[in-house]
Regions:
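N-terminal helix-turn-helix DNA-binding core of bacterial DNA-binding proteins
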Residues: 2-42
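Residues that scaffold the ATP/ADP-binding catalytic core of kinase and kinase-like folds
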Residues: 17, 80-81
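Short, hydrophobic-biased segments on the C-terminal half of alpha helices
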Residues: 47-49
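Beta-hairpin "wing" of winged helix-turn-helix
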Residues: 53-67, 72
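Short, flexible micro-motifs
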Residues: 11, 68, 80
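Ser/Thr-centric signal marking residues that sit
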Residues: 42-45, 74
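Amphipathic alpha-helical dimerization/coiled-coil segments
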Residues: 82-105
């Protein structure tokens, strides 16, 4: 898969994982596991990229005597999800065209 396409898909997946509530890295990985395997190092790279793009914010809070980073989606992150939904319709249309051509031969 094209690296740019995969990066975009993973970014949106992480945003979707935190859209309904603030979350921390372990829970994000756990929530995404039924859909996609994601290593901690990959997730941290994505989280840093999304934070630097102002699509999420980070806060630190104590949990069980330890500090934990919680990630919160911003309005810009929510807009990215909505934009992705619109883009996906176009991607599906292209996919249908490509697979139709393959099947017609």
């Amino acid at each position: 898969m094209d690296i740019q396409l995969k990066r975009g898909l993973l970014d949106v997946c992480v945003l979707a994982a935190i859209r309904s509530e603030d979350s921390y890295s372990y829970k994000i990985i756990k929530d995404m596991k039924p859909y996609i395997e994601l290593s901690e190092s990959t997730l941290y790279t994505i989280l840093k990229r999304l934070e630097s793009s102002d699509m999420l914010t980070v806060r630190t809070a104590e949990h069980g005597g330890r500090l934990r980073k919680y990630y919160h989606i911003t309005d810009k992150g929510l807009k990215r999800i909505e934009d992705f939904k619109k883009e996906w319709d176009e991607i599906l249309s292209i996919y249908r065209f490509v697979t139709k051509e393959d099947n017609d031969e």
